Swiss-Prot record:
Gene Ontology terms: cellular component: membrane; virion membrane
Membrane topology summary: Single-pass membrane protein
Bias type Polar residues, positions: 49-64
Record protein name field: Inner membrane protein H108R
Transmembrane regions listed in the UniProt entry: 10-32
């Protein structure tokens, strides 16, 4: 079920802001709303901290998987260098000049 208190409060505040023209009343309402928002967010953060577990759950599968997983960060790419040089001279990621492309007939 949806909590209608914040919606009702917002409607009341907007009505008061529209009907009053005094700056002091508006500032009072704005300060009350900001205090309400700050208190509400601090309460929800504290409630969230109380709901979390203090001890992390252990998962033996994850631990063994991370232990057995080999590092694949040091793969030698020297064998790919000649192919990259050839592709660099042949394709667009090398020396691409859009003005050297042939113009299609009828292109606007």
């Amino acid at each position: 079920m949806v909590n209608l208190f914040p919606v009702f409060t917002l409607i009341v505040i907007i009505t008061i802001l529209i009907t009053t023209r005094e700056l002091s009343t508006t500032m009072l309402i704005v300060s009350l709303v900001t205090d309400y928002i700050i208190i509400n967010t601090q309460y929800t953060e504290q409630q969230h901290e109380n709901n979390t577990f203090s001890m992390p759950q252990k998962n033996s599968f994850n631990e063994s998987y991370n232990k057995d997983k080999k590092s694949n960060t040091h793969i030698p790419y020297q064998w790919l260098a000649p192919e990259l040089k050839e592709a660099e001279s042949k394709y667009w990621w090398g020396n691409y000049d859009p003005h050297s492309e042939p113009v299609l007939a009828g292109a606007s």
